[in-house]
Regions:
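C-terminal coupling/interaction segments
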Residues: 261-316
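ABC transporter nucleotide-binding domain
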Residues: 171-260
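Structural motif
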Residues: 84, 244-247, 277
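ABC transporter nucleotide-binding domains
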Residues: 3-6, 13-207, 213
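Solvent-exposed beta-strand sheet faces enriched in polar/charged residues
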Residues: 9, 231, 283-285
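Short, flexible helix/strand-to-coil boundary loops that buttress conserved ligand/catalytic motifs
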Residues: 73, 221-224, 296
């Protein structure tokens, strides 16, 4: 099972003049959590719908385990749509059993799986309630149960964490981790970048329908410009402004955050700081995923994919 992966290869989609996807390419390996981030309208949902076969691509292909995704494969995908797709007037438990049977489980298997997932997700006491009577957080939990109830081989989740309280986020995060550990490729989109940073093995940043950066979170972060946090309490304002290759990112009050151009001498920065008096802290700071995202999304000139590693796909 080690080599199984979901591949999105050169997928394009247009709506009239609007390019929704432009040769979108990436893959998600078995046992990996892949975070899909981008502004609204960047193409995340379109990509997911094409992967599911809900939408046809104009060009390119989606493969699972080396073969094009077919109706049979799609039956093995657990999907959580962004616009939640449960029947509002159906009881939560009946809804889950119905969906499980739709995916080929027997009545007793469907009932057992429904019990297992509603207990795991903390909504077992709600299975007799109509979906529309549940709180938003509990509707989310039932929606996740709907994606899991047929024991899928692949999980595709569109904004699964939106509207969840911190406890539910922890429960859902643990479920996704457990699924990945069991060898399932998990892909989810999210606007909560600190969550993506904490949870994902790899991240793809999408802009205007194309993948603009893709790689392990640590590699993407360390691939950014080097930053140094300097706490020199007696340093006058602007003490670092004239240093070669150094940009002051922030020093409103307290420690100064500096960005170093490639090849800039951090020891020269340290000497300049020591010349002002004591230095309490002098530490390298990696940019957060939020910083990277801002940089990539606002920087319209980086049109080429920065592939930090060989993901088996070609750069878009």
């Amino acid at each position: 099972m080690g080599h199984r992966r979901l591949e999105v290869d050169g997928v394009s989609k247009r709506y009239g003049e609007t390019v929704a996807l432009d040769a979108m390419t990436f893959d998600v390996h078995a046992g990996e959590i892949f975070g899909f981030v981008g502004s609204n309208g960047a193409g995340k949902t379109t990509t997911m719908r094409i992967a599911l076969g809900v939408l046809a691509a104009d060009a390119g292909e989606v493969r699972w385990d080396g073969a094009p995704v077919t109706h049979r494969t799609r039956n093995r995908i657990g999907y959580m749509p962004e616009e939640r797709g449960l029947y509002p007037r159906m009881r939560a438990g009946e809804q889950l059993e119905y969906l499980a049977r739709l995916h080929g489980l027997s009545r007793s298997e469907a009932s057992r799986a429904t019990r297992q997932w509603t207990e795991r997700l903390g909504v077992a006491s709600r299975i007799g309630d109509e979906v529309q009577k549940l709180s938003l957080g509990n509707q989310q939990r039932v929606q996740l149960a709907a994606a899991l109830v047929h024991d899928p081989e692949i999980l595709v989740l569109d904004e699964p964490f939106s509207g969840l309280d911190p406890v539910a986020v922890d429960v859902m995060s643990q479920v996704l981790r457990d699924k990945a550990d069991a060898g399932v490729p998990v892909i989810f989109s999210s606007h909560q970048l600190e969550l993506v940073e904490r949870l994902c093995d790899r991240v793809g940043i999408v802009r205007s329908g194309a993948m603009v950066a893709c790689g392990a979170v640590g590699e993407l972060r360390s691939g950014g410009a080097e930053r140094i946090l300097v706490d020199a309490p007696q340093a006058p304002p602007g003490w670092a402004a004239g240093l070669p290759g150094v940009t002051v990112v922030g020093d409103a009050t307290g420690p100064t955050l500096l960005e170093l151009a490639p090849g800039a001498d951090d020891q020269a920065v340290l000497r300049a700081a020591l010349a002002t008096g004591p230095v309490r802290e002098f530490a390298r700071r990696l940019p957060s995923l939020t910083d990277l995202f801002r940089h990539v999304v606002s920087n319209e000139h980086t049109e080429h994919t920065e592939h930090v590693e060989d993901t088996g796909g070609t750069a878009a």
